[in-house]
Amino acid sequence: MSTLFTNNIASQNGTSIAVQSGHAITGAAGSIVVPKQMIQYEHNFANNTGFSTTSSSMVDVTNFYVDITPKYTNSLLIFECTLDSKTTTAAAYARYRLVDSNNSDTVMHTNTYIGQSNYWAGTSEWLTTSLRTVFVSGTTSTMRLQLQMQLNSGGTFEMNWSGSDQRVLQVTEIAV
């Protein structure tokens, strides 16, 4: 067996390189990276119950986190989740953000928030909220991507829809 050391491989003729039938290019996990392809997927299950707050400053949403150890510092991470909630005051509304709780609650997105819910909704209306954000990982250390929220305009924010409802929080790492 021989070893070929090179920084670039180019086709002598045309724009593609053929691999003979029955042969394959192999490598250790992560050694072959195709831009815009998924590198890894991580998730966490959380019950949509047992969380309420009156806080007008950011607090952790209990069990709404997902852990990931990015393979590359420049890859994109896509975070997604849904939740059901209501407020006890019609004018109240929630704002959400995503932080890395393993890194001093560093905010992971470029704007202040990643979404809102319950704005001028009735006090007995349970609303489903979808949250999604994309950001550059910036590290290969383990991250705990924690959802946080704050309640504006008073009242109480509740996530007590059903103890039998399970939510998926997920993060996908994408090569650039």
Feature-to-residue mapping (PLM):
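Glycine-rich, low-complexity segments
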Residues: 3-51
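Terminal beta-strand-rich extracellular "head" domains
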Residues: 45-60, 69-176
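Extended, low-complexity regulatory regions
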Residues: 64-66
